[in-house]
Regions:
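Active-site-proximal or metal-binding-adjacent scaffold patches in catalytic folds
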Residues: 1-173
């Protein structure tokens, strides 16, 4: 919880609602709520009806500075109203793609990813050996923060999973 200037204690959800409400007013939204939700992936869900909107924002953003949340809210709401076809602001992209973000959020992502062994060592193959060959051949750059893992259970439709933001690659065996 953080303390604002009026002496009130505000939760992160209150802070998020304040930001999304302020941006929403620019689009004539009068009833806006927003909350952080523990999704596995970095994402946002919303429901909108006439002048009401409810936003569920991945809690990976719960420690974002207000400026990042303002830019994020502005992009999302503008896209909902089809007034903005642009990508997220440079500040949002830089914050989410920073080493600090990955260091703080990757362990949370891994805990939420129930189908990962969290080990590159499989029954017959060590994925780090394969990754090392790719690096040696110059096909990828070495990334010390990359997490390579096997998936616990394989499905016929899914050969793997990748999260570019969280720097995780998982393969089914």
């Amino acid at each position: 919880m953080e303390n604002n200037n009026s002496g009130e204690h505000k939760t992160n959800d209150d802070r998020l609602t304040d930001i999304f409400s302020s941006v929403g007013r620019q689009y004539r939204l009068t009833d806006v709520t927003a909350q952080f939700v523990a999704f596995r992936d970095l994402k946002i869900r919303w429901q909108r009806s006439y002048k009401m909107a409810d936003f569920m924002v991945s809690d990976y953003l719960d420690d974002a500075p207000d400026g990042i949340l303002w830019d994020f809210a502005d992009t999302i709401i503008a896209k909902i109203f089809a007034e903005n076809d642009s990508d997220y602001s440079n500040s949002v992209i830089e914050w989410i793609s920073s080493d600090g973000f990955r260091a703080r959020k990757q362990p949370i992502y891994l805990r939420r990813s129930k189908n990962l062994t969290r080990s590159p060592v499989g029954r017959e193959k060590n994925l780090l050996d394969s990754y090392g060959r790719l690096v040696d051949d110059g096909l990828v750059e070495e990334d010390p923060g990359l997490c390579i893992s096997w998936m616990k259970s394989a499905t016929a439709r899914k050969i793997g999973h990748c999260s570019v933001v969280m720097d995780v690659v998982a393969l089914s065996g």
